[in-house]
Regions:
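Extended acidic/charged loop-beta regions that coordinate divalent cations
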Residues: 2-28, 65-111, 152-153
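ATP-dependent carboxylate-amine ligase catalytic core
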Residues: 1-45, 52, 59, 118-125, ...
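Structural signal for conserved beta-strand scaffold positions within catalytic alpha/beta enzyme cores
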Residues: 22, 58, 80-83, 158, ...
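Glycine-/small-residue-rich beta->alpha transition segments that form the dinucleotide
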Residues: 62
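Nucleotide phosphate-binding/pyrophosphate-handling subdomain across enzymes
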Residues: 10, 108-173
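Hydrophobic "anchor" residues on beta-strands that sit immediately upstream
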Residues: 19, 55, 164-168
Length: 173
């Protein structure tokens, strides 16, 4: 993880990624960085550290990333957006059942069944889908991987108790 400005730069100088992703800009690092714009600037260090001709995916619904991105050198990198109106997007309502969520993605021909709960999990799956396709995985393999995903315990874990379900999302609470 990252807690301060410069940490990602240091890490990418040690191991330069071929592929990098920023899924969201939250408030987890506010005490060290000041605000969401500063968090986006620190997280975008990963783009600067990504190898030449590398792949960078970002959540186009983040106004902070949208603000920082034009200030960065993206030449010689493939930059792909995901989210509403992005290069990779959800093209249907997200449906829920006891197994998880189901949604359509604009770069797949078949609906995605994801063993996870929460609309944000569909959003998190989008860059994974794109990366898998970029690595030439077959659609069937991608869909099977998402359908058989095993989530960390206590992270949107559905527990059956008698005639009811409890959604346990208490990880690090």
């Amino acid at each position: 993880g990252m807690e301060n400005k410069g940490e990602i730069t240091q890490l990418t100088s040690i191991a330069q990624p071929d592929i990098s992703v920023i899924t969201s800009i939250g408030s987890a690092h506010m005490e060290n960085l000041g605000g969401k714009l500063q968090i986006a600037q620190a997280k975008c260090e990963i783009l600067e550290g990504t190898k030449e001709n590398g792949l960078f995916l970002y959540n186009c619904e983040s106004k902070e990333i949208q603000e920082v991105l034009p200030t960065l050198d993206t030449e010689n990198k493939k930059v792909v957006s995901f989210g509403q109106g992005g290069d990779v997007s959800i093209t249907s309502d997200i449906e829920y059942d006891k197994e998880g969520i189901v949604f359509n993605c604009n770069i797949l021909d078949t609906p995605v069944h994801l063993r996870a709960f929460g609309d944000f999990q569909a959003m998190n799956a989008l860059p994974c889908i794109y990366i898998a396709k970029a690595c030439h995985l077959k659609e069937e393999s991608i869909l099977n991987g998402l359908k058989n995903l095993e989530m960390t315990k206590m992270r949107t874990q559905l527990i059956s108790v008698k005639n009811a379900y409890i959604l346990d999302d208490t990880y690090k609470s």
